[in-house]
Amino acid sequence: MTEKLQPLRGIKDLLPDDYKVHDYIISKARDVGVLYGYKQMSTPILEYTKVFNRSMGESSDVISKEIYSFLDKSNESVALRPEFTAGIIRSFISNGLQHKLPLKLFSTGPVFRYDRPQAGRQRQFHQLNYEYIGAKGAITDAETLKLAIDILKALAIEQDTLLELNSLGCSESRSAYKQKLVEYLSDFKDQLSEESKIRMIKNPMRILDSKSEIDQKIVAYAPILSEYYTDESKEYFDELIKYLDILGVKYSINPRLVRGLDYYCHTAFEFTTNKLGSQSTILAGGRYDGLSRIMGNNDDVPAIGFAAGIERIALMREYDISEVKPVFVLPIGDNNITYALEIVDKLRAQNIATIVEPLGKIAKRMQRVLNENAKFIIFIGDEEQENNSIKLKDLEKQEEYIVDFAKAFELLKKY
């Protein structure tokens, strides 16, 4: 017996009903982005692995455990994108867009991470992504957070989320903090998880984000990053808070919040929910002023951005999405098909969605139409063809009309 082929584990088909929801979410998010001046762009799904290694850091979970990376036929190491930001900054540099700053860019599409599949976490998933490149100062951070809030409002889930906010400070602040954090953690190094023992050497701040219960108990009493802010870092965060208060943005300061990637500085944020169990983060991002230089640009370029998981948004609520109900055209006999196709072409030319059902017994074709919840059927028989007319049936009102094309179009365009 021939093997029944299945999709890869953790990678799902997007069937029409799923795609309808995804398309709705993307459309709503795109519309809000346009109001803020964002323009859509796309980067390749496949990049050189070094694009992500360099930007995300060798010690990150994504690079060390989750990236889909392999050698192609030219023996080049390539990878499926695990996130958008690195590819967008690579594109910004390789296309010489420095003279077009500032740039507000929106992207959407699939990303890939070799993770343990569960509800709200798949190996292929889809993201909304926003990057504000050339964005300097706390005011742009506040605007970016307001954009995120307005997107969640447009999707009717903002009321079910909490904005958690922190500042990672400048490089000087983080350097001083890492030193104190390592000193504190050294007293517990034998108790830390194996993963955190490695992180303690490569990037100790990542231990704050550990999922290990033992690690969490240890870091609960660790030094707080804000205690090591420089005057500049403190002023920056205070200014951001001032703008958020002016805008009426509700937030919770989480001093343990760090981002999972190496390129973040200053503002870091997550919108979380209690409706999705352990997969609580709906949208997350932060500022990354140093990434462009890491990626090969001559100078640092200030930037801030965020991404939101479409699958997780879709799990937050059921969306009542209205659909265009097509008109179905049923030729009664084979000799009526040509005339039926002419009618179909005329209706489509008037932007009326139309489906022709030419094959099979009338009863079976009618059943297919009813299964689609159609509102109108057009029957084309010998009489209609001879008189250059149309028999139009309104399935909701159970009324029939025998009319010419102009009258049929007049009736249909009302719906």
Swiss-Prot record:
Belongs to the class-II aminoacyl-tRNA synthetase family. Homodimer. This is Histidine--tRNA ligase. It catalyses: tRNA(His) + L-histidine + ATP = L-histidyl-tRNA(His) + AMP + diphosphate + H(+). It is found in: Cytoplasm. Disulfide bonds: none annotated. SUPFAM superfamilies: Class II aaRS ABD-related, Class II aaRS and biotin synthetases. GO terms for cellular component: cytoplasm. It comes from Rickettsia akari (strain Hartford). Pfam families: HGTP_anticodon, tRNA-synt_His.
